[in-house]
UniProtKB/Swiss-Prot annotation:
GO cellular component annotations of the record: cytoplasm
Protein name, as recorded: Nucleoside diphosphate kinase
Enzyme class: transferase
Pfam families found in the cross-reference section: NDK
EC number: 2.7.4.6
Oligomer status and interactors: Homotetramer.
Family, per entry: Belongs to the NDK family.
One example of a Gene Ontology biological process annotation: CTP biosynthetic process
Length: 140
């Protein structure tokens, strides 16, 4: 297995409830290492840019509003099979369908307020990491 990097975000519903440490602990327990992290309050413009892939979807406006409603923690995670491992630890997008022991089963409030975001492929991981971090900010 190759060591890879992925992008991870702790969303406003989770930071609002002081779950940052608990979520990071679950990621680290799964063997993922945080190699870059910062707390940001997204502007509407940043949220629109980050989620531009969804701009034609009916939920786009609500997503942008939610993501700019409070602080997020953006991170770069590193580990073996990091993308798949992070997605496994996060659980299904809809917390009602998430497996026991996953972040979303434990902490998500709804399909919209589902506590975390993670890249789904190497290409999106690279794009999402570059959106928030310069190369010098990633130290691992």
């Amino acid at each position: 297995m190759a060591i890879e990097r992925t992008f991870s975000m702790i969303k406003p519903d989770a930071t609002r409830r002081n779950l940052t440490g608990a979520i990071i602990a679950k990621l680290e327990e799964a063997g993922l290492r945080v190699v870059a992290s910062k707390r940001v309050w997204m502007s509407r413009r940043e949220a629109e840019g980050f989620y531009a892939v969804h701009k034609d979807r009916p939920f786009f406006g609500e997503l942008v509003e939610f993501m700019s409603s409070g602080p997020t923690v953006v991170q770069v995670l590193e580990g073996e099979n990091a993308i798949a491992k992070n997605r496994e630890v996060m659980g299904a997008t809809n917390p009602a369908n998430a497996d026991e022991g996953t972040i979303r089963k434990a902490f998500a409030l709804s399909i919209g307020e589902n506590s975390v975001h993670g890249s789904d492929a190497p290409e999106t991981a690279a794009e999402e990491i570059a959106y928030w971090f310069s190369g010098t900010e990633i130290v691992g």
